[in-house]
Each structure stands twice: as C-alpha cells, then as structure tokens.
Amino acid sequence: MWVLIISELLVFGAGLAAFLSVRITDPAGFAEAQDHLHRVSAGINTIVLITSGYFAALAYRLCSTGRKKQSRFALFSAMALGCVFLVIKTWEYVEKAGQGITTETHPFFTFYYLLTGFHAAHVLAGIVILGLVSFFATPRNIETGAAFWHMVDLVWVLLFPVIYLLR
C-alpha cells in the first residue's frame, strides 16, 4: 500500500507543479479564473475531509482495543463524510457547467477539473476501501485503509490552498 500511496502523491505533486508552472505564464488570467470558484464550499470540504480522517484514525484505535462495532461506526462516519465531500464537489461542478465553464475555458480550469476530478476519484476509491475494510475489520486492515484515506486528505490539504487561495 505504501508504494501506491507514494506513487499517487508523486502524481498529484507533478500535477500541482504543472499547474504552478503554467500559472506563472498568466497570473492575471489564473486569478480572474480563480474568482469563479467557491472558496467557502472548498473550505467546508476541507473541514469535512479532515474530520473524516479523524474518524478513520479513531476506527484504527477502536479496533486495536477490541471495539470492532464502534470501529465500524467510525469507518462508516468517515465514509459518510467522504460522500458529503463528493456531493459538495458535484454541486461545484454542476454550477461551473451551468456557467459554461469547461476545461476549454482557460488553462486554469483545465487543471482545476483534472486535479480536483482525479482527487474526487480517489475519494470514491477511498470510500470503497473503507467499506471493504469495515467488513474485514482487523487493526492491520483498518490501518491500511486509513493510510490511503489520509493520503486523500493530504492531497486535498495541498490542492485547496494552491487552487482556491494562492494568488
């Protein structure tokens, strides 16, 4: 799992590096495009994912002390918050589409959709992994699932300021 996590972090790192490299060529255009984003909903999504990471870590601690039922509840809480993240992100995409904003609108939005879409796919994969782990709840399995989930959290904590806040 660690090889997968490190390789995924490298892929996201390359995407962020490309975003920042292209941003240097058109800072005004990127800033103008960025004004179309909802910083508040992205901030809420940040809180949602960090909280879900807490529940994933709690699940490991609970399972390690023999409390499997509570551990499963913590995993389902992390999964539910992952679903909340995806609902908010989908709303954001639908709203952008309604404004006619696509990957072709500006290079900023090409990167926005690619990076956040790839991340959303990882959130979905993480929800599936946490679901599988909940059925085979051992400390080792939960630790593995939580490690992937924390990678998803970490990526968002990097994407959020770079895409939504950095000017």
Describe these PLM feature segments.
Residues M1-R167:
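...captures the hydrophobic TM-helix bundle architecture rather than a specific catalytic motif
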